[in-house]
């Protein structure tokens, strides 16, 4: 994302992020 801003936990409940032991690897929307 270019020009995006970080959000607080629970601020956008329809977004998901998938993590494995190495860190973030995928994201999406519900």
Curated annotation (Swiss-Prot):
- Top-tier EC class: hydrolase
Keywords assigned by UniProt, alphabetized: Blood coagulation cascade activating toxin, Fibrinogenolytic toxin, Hemostasis impairing toxin, Hydrolase, Protease, Secreted, Serine protease, Toxin
**Tissue and organ distribution:** Expressed by the venom gland.
Subcellular location(s): the record lists:
Secreted
Cellular component annotations (GO), alphabetically ordered: extracellular region
Q: Name one GO biological process term.
A: proteolysis
Q: What is its EC number?
A: 3.4.21.-
Q: What is its main location?
A: secreted
One term of GO molecular function: serine-type peptidase activity
The answer to whether keyword Heme applies is: no
* Function, as annotated: Thrombin-like snake venom serine protease that cleaves alpha-chain of fibrinogen (FGA) releases only fibrinopeptide A. Shows coagulant, esterase and amidase activities.
Family the entry assigns = Belongs to the peptidase S1 family. Snake venom subfamily.
What's the protein name? Thrombin-like enzyme LmrSP-2
Q: Which organism is it from?
A: Lachesis muta rhombeata (Bushmaster)
The taxonomic lineage of its organism, from the top, reads: Eukaryota, Metazoa, Chordata, Craniata, Vertebrata
């Amino acid at each position: 994302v270019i020009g995006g801003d970080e959000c607080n936990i629970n601020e956008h409940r329809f977004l998901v992020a998938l993590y494995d032991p190495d860190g973030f690897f995928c994201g999406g929307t519900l």
